Amino acid sequence: MAHYLLQVGYTPETWKALVHNPQDRSEAITGAVEKLGGKVERFWMAFGEYDVVGVVDMPDNVSAAAFAMAISAGGACKNIKTTPLMSTKEGIEAMRKAATCGYTPAKAKAAGR
């Protein structure tokens, strides 16, 4: 399964509801992820730009996107960021593949030409 880093920011209304009725939202997240064929690896509360951070395993990008859409459609979050994760082994494999793809960057035109 593919790994994804999820970062979620709550709306002020969601914070108001949670402050007045504290609850563990990881249970709701876990249930939704599992219904999409995934698994929650870790889940944390945070502060700053994002209020919740988690690492989930999902069967594919479509399932990860569906989860992000479901969270967004619920209206409790002001932003959600999903980042696909790779192992270092996969990263090195990608570096080796990148070296063989033949891409060349744009070059500036020489002065006076």
Which positions does each model-derived feature cover?
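A compositional/biophysical signature of low hydrophobicity enriched in polar/charged and small residues
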Residues: 1-113
